[in-house]
Amino acid sequence: MDALAGLLDGPRAKGAFLLRMIMEPPWSVRVEDGAPLCLMCVTGGEAWVVPGTGAPVLLKPGDIAVVRGPEPYTVADAPGTPPRALAGPGGECTSLDGEPLDQSMRLGVRTWGNAPDGTATVLVGTYRMDGEVGRRLLDALPGLLHLPADTWHCPLMPFLEEEVSRDEPGQSAVLDRVLDLLLISAVRAWFSRPGAEAPAWYRAMGDPVVGRALRLLQNDPAHPWTVASLAAKTGVSRAALARRFTALVGEPPMAYLTGWRLALAADLLRGTDATVESVARQVGYSGAFALSAAFKRVRGLSPQEHRAGA
């Protein structure tokens, strides 16, 4: 599993909140749902995203924005339009006075707004994210990522708009997967921009030697890797691999592997009921004692304390 695949297993959409918003000016929605990640696509008209800090961003048809939470932000027809609705946790929407608006502004299946024929249409998907594997990638993103339509092409956006209002068996799973793919496409396009400040390990994926070594480590962390075995797989000497890996990734191969294993272990400890012994073996440690020692050394707490939320 590479880091982009890890993103799918980190903030992966599992019953994510997905909504088509149809609005006619003036309109403004203050978002205070605490979601760690929100993806917005404009399919008609325009919308402004006004973050808590930083400049407002105008979204036009075909544009996509990814907002990293949990800080509040506003989506509106214009930056200066006062909020008329408040979006809280779980997609609950109220007036500023606390009056529920979910039913009064409901326009159909997963469709909400102030006018059925409004000029602005925005697809909104919010994620729950508990995984550290995905967070390793998301932490490299800006608070507000904006991809204009003329800088990338993704055929998934029209498909998502078509599917969002359907109410058929398995539809939630379909929408979750499409949302996942749209997010991955956006992140990949963002990091591929000229001059993009992608994480070092992401840039290193393009190197024929280090990229192969990274994929080997990520795809099979339980293997008893050594610098020598990695070097043999990549066709270079141990010294050459260690030097090249450290220069491109920013840390030696075994240090990177330790961080990757512990991130995987942290997710398994929080997301499953597997024993510490089982988790240890899944991520490449000989047993619970070895994992506990590494966890304590690197993170300052035991696996049990991490699982308990310490």
Model-derived regions: residue spans:
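Short helix-to-turn junction characteristic of helix-turn-helix DNA-binding domains
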Residues: V42, L217-D220, L268-L269
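Generic protein-terminus/edge-of-domain signal
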Residues: M1-A65, E71-N114
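Conserved hydrophobic/aromatic beta-strand scaffold that supports enzyme active sites
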Residues: R20, C41, I64-V66, V122-T126, ...
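An amphipathic alpha-helical interaction segment
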Residues: A120-Q218, A240
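Generic structural signal for alpha-helix termini and adjacent loop/cap motifs
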Residues: G45, A78, E163-R166, S192, ...
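Hydrophobic residues on short alpha-helical segments
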Residues: L39, E161, L214, A263-A266
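Basic/polar phosphate-binding segments, predominantly the helix-turn-helix DNA-binding elements
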Residues: L181, S185-F191, R212-A263, S278-G309
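Glycine-rich phosphate/pyrophosphate-binding loop
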Residues: D117
